Amino acid sequence: MPKSALIAFLTLSTAMTAPAFAQEAPAAPTASTPAATTPTDPAAPAEAAPAATAMTPEQIVAFNTAVTDFTAGQSAQQSGDNATAVTKYEAAIPAIKTAVESDPSKMDNVNFLANALYANAAAYGAMGQLDKTIALYGESLPYWRKLVEAKPTDAASRNILAGILIQMGNQKLGAQDKAGSAPLYSEALTLARKSVAENATDNINKNILLSALIGASQSTSDTAHQTEAVEMSKKMLADGSVDATNKPSAQALTGAPQAG
């Protein structure tokens, strides 16, 4: 996928997640509230979680500073200052990782870490440093998977995970690693189909599914994926719901004329 397309997808995805997390950040532990507590999320997996380890006062202070750094990073990123955003995110991430390691079952902190890594990836992507973007995507992947498993009705997290998988698949496909890209697209397809099944009229859901189908059709010999991608492209081109990222591929698949 062209670099411009990747950055466009990053912009779309960041717009979906940043406001949601901005409301959760103030609820992070404070110096008088230890981060390691018994999980209260009713949607958490039923299996036994690793025992929590109490954070030290120093670690709690560092975590509180990380909340401030993350918030500053968001502000910088939203104003277009991605270099400052990266500096702030990278200052925040180590303390957030420590909190997650102290209590892996505390989903608020898992969510915080997933968002921090993802936002950092987006900032690097906006600066054209796509190798770092993909590396951060890979680092964030287990945390997004954990969130989606714990909160199966959270469509926003599910779509972000699908988008990450698609971009990682695109990177491998661009390097001619079809075998490496195929399972990433397959996982993304499952997630995207669920989102479309829940809300078939949502354009974000449809475009994520189309992206996954386009990738899957190029990474395997399964002609069903290409057939589905062609049919979906025709419908979305006709009703105008295809986004700028998918439009060139949709036009190529259907033989539709391309502008310019």
Region locations from a protein language model:
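N-terminal leader/linker segments that initiate helical-solenoid repeat arrays
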Residues: A22-E90
